[in-house]
């Protein structure tokens, strides 16, 4: 399936299941050798290391302007935590053996903007700021970047504008970081963006432009608006390699976090990482970093709402960004606002298709159930998008075809580590979180 023949595509049995909003799990029929998979993009390990070096240069500045980063010396990072009670209760709920150990990656509680977007979004703003500052002679690569916290630097950056299209969290991270540096910022937000996120941005002086349409329209309009201003830099969530590399740094850093927790990752102790997927930049970048750090022993699996399975649809059909969920009759309406994306990134889909084991869809009903369980069992509050990874553990443990295709035996499954990548929730106001929990009842 490589041409857009919608009629033929809609006869496919998996597409029929997607059209019916069913929860499905689809995986690549056989694993691609990692060396081959990594060659699908021109990006390399050196590019990820360059991104980490840039974040290190900015650490003194970040530590100075964000009090919450003082304890980490300006490093934006989240912890991994064991979730044994969640594992016990979910295993009973799924009627599966509680194999391996379950962990949660708390990007939901990343400092500054409380979501995974604090990685890619903030990194791209910093990369752009550095480029401008170096060119203007405000800093050199050897300087302490904390000197960018000055009226002179803010005045300089105010001559420039940053624009982005977002369903919410990316706009939040880019808006907060850009405003702190002194940039003028416009965030073009889709209809499904939460009101509190818009209110937060406006309180920082960010220009929020609202659309009655979905994410794709917000991005397109943001791109058009930026074209008319030569001093406006548009952050393109669909195609940005800079965003992608900002996320990839997390993959490299996770390796050390696993070592610190005495978590073994090798042929007999596989690591399964479950990543919620919207347009694809966040999970794609993280997976790219993970594959460079841990090789074939890490299995990355993407989770999408039943109403918005854009990456699964793009990769499965081979059409990537040439097809959207509306083409098969889906409405792209989900409580998981961060995942309400109708058309996947073609760049990410093509770059990562041989490195991702599989893709599954999850209903809003299950999302709310897992929000409730995570709150009750671990006292961790997450937004709907952030719990999408939970259902993946069920698929890995019960899908015999997947286990055979990826040569996973009973001992490996017993020794496995399952990491649910929680993508957001830390900045959700208490009254909004109560609404989520009420919907779970």
From Swiss-Prot:
Q: At which residues is N6-(pyridoxal phosphate)lysine found? A: 117
- Asked whether the keyword Cell inner membrane is assigned, the reply is no
Q: Which reaction does it catalyse?
A: D-serine = pyruvate + NH4(+)
Keywords, in A-Z order: Lyase, Pyridoxal phosphate
Required co-factor(s) are:
pyridoxal 5'-phosphate
Please list the GO biological process terms of this entry. D-serine catabolic process; isoleucine biosynthetic process
Per the record, a Pfam family? PALP
InterPro entries associated with the record = D_Ser_am_lyase, Ser/Thr_Dehydratase, Ser/Thr_deHydtase_PyrdxlP-BS, TrpB-like_PALP, TrpB-like_PALP_sf
One molecular function GO term is: hydro-lyase activity
Instruction: Return the EC number.
Output: 4.3.1.18
PROSITE patterns documented for this protein = DEHYDRATASE_SER_THR
Instruction: Give the record's family classification.
Output: Belongs to the serine/threonine dehydratase family. DsdA subfamily.
Q: NCBIfam families, from UniProt? A: D_Ser_am_lyase, PRK02991.1
Question: Per its record, how is this protein called by name?
Answer: Probable D-serine dehydratase
Tell me what gene encodes this: dsdA
